[in-house]
Amino acid sequence: MTATPAAPQGALLPNPAKERLLAGETVLGMNVRVIRSGDIARIAKTTGHDFIFIDMQHSLYTVETIGHIAQVALAIGVTPMVRVRGVDDPDTSVLLDNGVTGIVFPDVNSAAEAKRAVDRCRYPPVGRRSVGGGYPMFDYRPTPLVDAVAALDSAVLTVCMIETREGLENVEAIAAVDRVDVLHVGSNDLLAALGLPGQFGCPQHLAALDRVIAAAKAHGKIAGVGGDRNLARQVEFIRKGMRFVTTNSEIAFMLAEGGRVTSELRKALA
């Protein structure tokens, strides 16, 4: 009987979405709110998505369920990202220890909050993430901690959402925080905060997006956007410089196609 092989020295943990962003590409993500199996990662891949955006903030997902979905996503080359409940969400560390390679922090309003987000994602001396062991990302192979920590730190993608007046006013300072990777505009909440709920594509919305893009470029970060599901506007946002884009949710995709099919059949039966 042979011993379990150790992970190779200098073990690497892939994050396909991060790798594409570093190569100057645009990545597309599917919002996930209701499907509770790893099959959603496979569907996301088949439909051309680079990452899944698991919404812990607005859903009933447990940490265990997210871990199972994330580990399937990792195995098939889709980046598993989770929107947690805030910059101080204590579940951030356990998610990262169990398959998740990107964290989306909602309602980031200041540089201090952005730094707290980084602290949750990064190991010392950069951050305050606790060092564990026996990581599923390495198939539980014995891995020297120095290699595991380096690989996990390199793979993580830290996303700060800009979705309040305060966050927008401080976006340049947020962008300047070291190890923040993406500034992601939450269009729904931002427009609500501006007193313009649902007015996607209005001048104030477009001006906010331009400001975030400019701040990201000035500090070597990635600009992203979600919430506005109009395809024509999404194309324009990408052309302007948005490179981390959520397309729509699995709920919306199922409703759209399911509704289309039943509508056509009802017409045929009329």
Regions inferred by a protein language model and the residue ranges of each:
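N-terminal amphipathic alpha-helix/helix-capping segment at the start of soluble metabolic enzymes
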Residues: M1-N31, P142-S154, D210-A218
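Alpha-helix-loop-beta-strand connector modules within alpha/beta enzyme cores
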Residues: P16, V63-D97, C121-G127, A150-D153, ...
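Active-site mouth loops of central-metabolism enzymes
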Residues: L21-G38, P80-R85, V156-E169, I222-D228
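Short, well-ordered coil/turn segments that N-cap beta-strands
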Residues: A23-L28, H49-D50, L74-P80, V100-T101, ...
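Glycine-rich, proline-tolerant flexible connector loops at the mouths of alpha/beta enzymes
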Residues: I40-A41, K45-G67, S187-P203
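Catalytic cores of alpha/beta
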Residues: R42, V82, V87-T101, F105, ...
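C-terminal helical cap(s) of enzyme catalytic domains, especially alpha/beta-barrels
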Residues: I69, A111-G127, I251-A270
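Conserved anion-binding
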Residues: P90, G102-D178, D189
